[in-house]
Amino acid sequence: GVPQQLVDRYGRTVRDLRLSITDRCNLRCTYCMPAQGLQWLPTPDLLTTAELTRLGRIAVERLGVERIRLTGGEPLMRRDLEEIVEALSALRTSAGAKPDIALTTNGLGLEKRAAGLRAAGLDRVNISIDSLDPQDYAAITRRDRLADVLTGIAGAQEAGLDPIKVNAVAVPATVEERAPRLLAECLRRGWQLRFIEHMPLGPRETWSSQDVVGVDQILEVLREAGFTLTEVGRPDRRPAALWRVAAGSALGQEHPAGTVGVIASVTAPFCSDCDRTRITAD
């Protein structure tokens, strides 16, 4: 039969489901978590593979969801991730299509699992990296693991999980230095960079509107560094507004053409046409 649609009271139809499959993480990013003393959910409280599959089945077969994104915590911390991906990939929409399955990850351990995840039906990955400078990365994440993340990305590319999208949180102290370097490096490596405005997450009382580097400021920093940007807009109601970057030179180095995105959830919220919903790990 024709699926029912999941429509909220504002008339927004849900097409995109975010499944958080764990609250655990192996990094301790300063804007997200305290350095220590975190209480994780007891394992029996986390949704099981069967429960996640059942939720996915209802969403895809009966409610018209077309895209599923697995998030955490860090989803690679679940040993049954391949099983979860395989079960969700086997679902079919009412039109007979496989749902698009994506993973948001910090990339640690991805090199060992990328091929298996691809074989299980994973379509693409978003990797969270706020800096490609090892010391800077260690200061942000409180873990010296950048080399492992880069190995993880190489594994994902080898497995055919292209294009690689990189998510970076923009914070005021370092945006002028960090953002242009990160964009130049991502363009050279063929990765699609998305800056994310710093949202009120993480330890209580640690967020203030002073911490937000808005989309206009990010663009200004990039243009001042020498990048030529042309607005593309927000394709398919996705959260990221995109700009085309012309090939040229910035920071004294050549770079190829590409795109850069900004997810401006604080300064330019896109709630009115949002088509996603989230289920937490418990």
Go through each PLM region and give its residues.
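Canonical Radical SAM [4Fe-4S] cluster-binding loop centered on the CxxxCxxC motif
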Residues: 10-49
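A short acidic, helix-capping loop that chelates divalent metal ions and anchors anionic groups
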Residues: 37-42, 133-140, 202-206
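Accessory C-terminal segments flanking Radical SAM cores
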Residues: 201-282
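N-terminal [4Fe-4S]-dependent radical SAM core
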Residues: 1-18, 28-30, 61-63, 242, ...
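Residue-level recognition of specific faces of alpha-helices
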Residues: 13, 18, 31, 67-69, ...
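Conserved beta-strand segments that form the floor/walls of ligand-binding pockets within enzyme
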Residues: 16, 20, 69, 102-104, ...
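Radical SAM/AdoMet-radical enzyme domain recognition
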Residues: 46-49, 53-69, 78-196
